[in-house]
Amino acid sequence: MSNITMKELLEAGVHFGHQTKRWNPKMKPYIFGARNGIYIIDLQKTVRLFKNAYNFVRENAQAGETMLFVGTKKQAQDAIGEEAVRCGMYFVNQRWLGGMLTNFVTVKQSIDRLKRLDAMFADGSIEAYTKKEALQLEKEREKLEKILGGIKGMGKLPGALFVIDPKNETIAISEAKKLGIPVVAVVDTNCDPDPIDYVIPGNDDAIRAIRLLTSKMADAVIEGSQARDAVLQTGDEEAMEAAAEESGAEA
């Protein structure tokens, strides 16, 4: 299990919240105090709640479910994209399209269009078009890739969302709640924790804090996926042994 230590949290600045004048009173239970007009997050609670979130994400992956990493603010884009790819999951790190979950059938049509364009450029069939047409198709492809590239392989709705800054991703969270999809989120002192199923109190603005927490969630996915693979492999071996015994008995 990938534990998170108080030292890691402190070094990444996870304990720094927002200015005291910019806060959500619902975050009071997660606040240790204030220093120089900045709220300090209670890292003991962060450690405990992080473990709950980690266990859920691991179990979600072990059950064969997928997770969608969401973080469109500039500080989160790289970590969200890179860590999702590292653990073989999906991500949205540019712009959340309204209906990305609640109208997934329509979004999937755009994904299919992107895949067709990719194939045209890969197999050379784009050469059948004029230079002007090919340029227009390339622009369309780039636009679709920017928004949908991170969910190109997502054939169905995810089993969970991991979100950086719920205040910035209200539409994504609202859609997840409508569909009953659990949400894990890094929640800063200016956020409303109520819609979040697994709250991780922490700094959602510092790049190091975002990277640390996102990478740990990716570790949880990897751990769960590996456990699932091990079980499936054991099951396959047992099935093969049973089949071999049956054929031996028949002989």
Swiss-Prot record:
Taking the record's annotation, the residue ranges forming a coiled coil are none
Q: Ribonucleoprotein among the record's keywords?
A: yes
User: What Pfam family is a match for this entry?
Assistant: Ribosomal_S2
Name the Gene Ontology molecular function terms of this record: structural constituent of ribosome
Out of the domains of life, which is the source?
Answer: Bacteria
Q: Which Gene3D superfamilies match?
A: Glucose-6-phosphate isomerase like protein, domain 1, Helix hairpin bin
Q: Transmembrane ranges?
A: none
How is this protein named in the record? Small ribosomal subunit protein uS2
This protein's gene is called: rpsB
